[in-house]
Each structure stands twice: as structure tokens, then as C-alpha cells.
């Protein structure tokens, strides 16, 4: 709360909270156990101990903490949770609409705890229920918010700093008023939505790293923290695997030109990374390298594709109707084949859908059997300055050759802001290291093999 209350004291604040650590995973596992007919009581008890333990600790630390009402809220929600789990156990499946309600319990508990903390410190606050304010459409478990329509609903929310606004993340409602969730990184997405809806001056996302790096610091030694990114650069990096941000999060803040600052809760003194329309004072053609893992590539080919209007759109319509996101697309100039990449978790379903949709063409050999290639990764080079710098593509592919990596497919957008290659997953880590070294490092690593350690060899060592 120190970070949030300090902000409120200077300029007012609104805070979006995610669930306590481990709670969402526990809720997901409870659904799985119940659907499988397993005994979920031990995990349920552990979850109960976790959240009530947080409330008990806060009660000891803060005078005036509304312990009784907080515990009553927790018990009420866990009682409803248990009823849902019993129903899932009888059904043998967790319906998506029920799962959405279950998975969001942690966020509501976080908000209740946080609101009680603020009240104990004498800070006026208001809890915003996103089910009332945030309108979304799509799957129950991965919806997309309609920011324009949602913004109109926020007309009664004070933005003058008189009240500290607190909202659960990860949650919204569909047109029927049913609770839905916003998918991976849902709380960050919720923060961007709230920032847009209340015309915030800045959206700060507090995470467990110092900001956005020019490569994954867990894989690349010497990865450098980026001080600034444009919205477009951030979108490209996040879309192709940068784990700090999700592409959905960038959309609302870019559309409404709201600066977004990525900060570290464990290191609040770190400056973080600013995402805005501003460009870094130090000009660089390339900003970063991202890696998207667990990719499967489909190749749809055959004489039926050439000159046939609408064949490509049919392929993508099949994916769209199944809510399967396509990461990368390439098409041969001969129009004989079209290739695209999706997340591997969707591969089996996608193949079945394509074979059903094109059964007649496959039967009459207008299309070849659909090729599927697993265990791939997409490595992408990103930077606004790429379009003004000649020879970057050559350096990129020379780096891949240096790493002894073959390209499965290549794609570049017309904006020339990024260039991507599809490669084997097992070679991705090596590829990223070599690319980073060639584009960002002044020091280059070489391998030296010394055979025979006589006087000269010993002196060299």
C-alpha cells in the first residue's frame, strides 16, 4: 500500500489489484480436481488458510482494520465456491461461465483486504465492481473489453482525487451482465482499461522486474533495461513473446495516448520503462529481441489455392470462428501455398477444423494434405528505427547463420518496424543470444581451443 497511498497523497490514484500470490492457480486446480471427481477439500482448506491468514496478519498490524467484516466477506465467497465445486463434481465438467466466477474470487478478496487497509489508515476509498462498469465480449475466460462503451459507464466515478479508487482486475461483464474474465495478464489489461475510462495521466504497472529489457534477461546475459518504448514498439515486443506485457494491455493506453510506466514492486527506486509517444533520447535502430515459444506452423497448399478468390479468407475464417489467434502469416508469390503460425495448445483443434472445412478440396486433391510442423519458435527483431537503417535484415539473417539456425519461415510487416523468423524451438535460445550479441554488444565471445600446454600454451593461459 505504501506505493499506492504515496501516489494518492500527491495526485489521486486508482488501483487495480490481482489475486494474492498463488490463489488463482489454486482456484484453477480446484476446478480441475472437482471436474475429475477428486477430493478437493485439502486444497480448499489450504486456500482458506491462505486468505484468512492474510486478513489475520493485517488485523495484527493495523489499528482499526475491519477484521470481522473482511472475514465475513471471505467466508461468504468461499462458501459459494464450495457449492460451485460440488456442482462441478456432479457434472464432471466446469462450465466456462461458472469457471469465470470461480477464477475471479481472488481479485475480489484482494480488493476487500486493500480497501480495509486504506480505511484503517483513514483514506477514503471507493470499490469499483468491474461487472457493473467494464463491458466486454468474447469467451467467458478470455474476453475483450469495449473501452468506448465502458467509458460511458464511468460517468459517476469521481476522478478529482477525493476518493481512492480500487478495482478488481481480470474481471468484466458481457452484454447479459454475466461475469467474464480477461485472460492472461488480465489485471494489467484491467489497469489499462481503467486508465482509459477515467482519462488517467499515467498508467503504472507494478510487476516483479525493473521494466522491459531488450531481450529476456533470464536467457541473455547482458540484456539491457529500456528506458523508453513507443506504443508500437511495445506492441511488437509484447505480441512476439515479451512476458512483461500483453498486447491487449497496450491497446487502450495507445488509443487514448496514456503514458504507461512499468515498475518493480521489489525495487521501487528503479526508474522502470516508459511506454508513450516519446522516443528515447539515445537513437537506436533496434530496440529489442523477443521470442515466442510453443508455436506450431500450418502449411495449406495445392492447386486449388492459385487464382481462387476467397481461399485464404476461408482459412483465416476457420481460425477466427474458433477464437484461435494467428501469430504470423506467409504466402508464396505463386499463390500455391499459405503458411501461418498459432500457439501449440490450439494445434490439434485447428487441424481438425481445417480438415472439416476443406474436406471437399482435400478429397478432390485441390489441396494437398495439410502440413503441420510442431516445436517451433518465433524470434523477432523490433525497433522504430529499422525502416531508416539499411542492412538490418542482412545482419539479422547473418546472425542466424552464425548460430547455425535454419529459417523455417520469414515475415516482415509493411511498417518495417519488425522482422520475424520461425525456427526450431531447440535452437531459439542460441539464436537470440547471437542476435543480441551482434546488435547490442560491443564485446564478442569467441571459442579458443588450445591443444598442448607447453611453455607457450601455459604462458597464454
Each language-model region and where it sits:
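Hydrophobic aliphatic residue packing
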Residues: 2-7, 15-16, 102, 164-166, ...
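Charge-rich, low-complexity amphipathic helices
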Residues: 38, 96, 139-141, 217-218, ...
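Acidic/polar loop patches that form or flank catalytic/metal-binding clefts of enzymes
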Residues: 246, 257-264
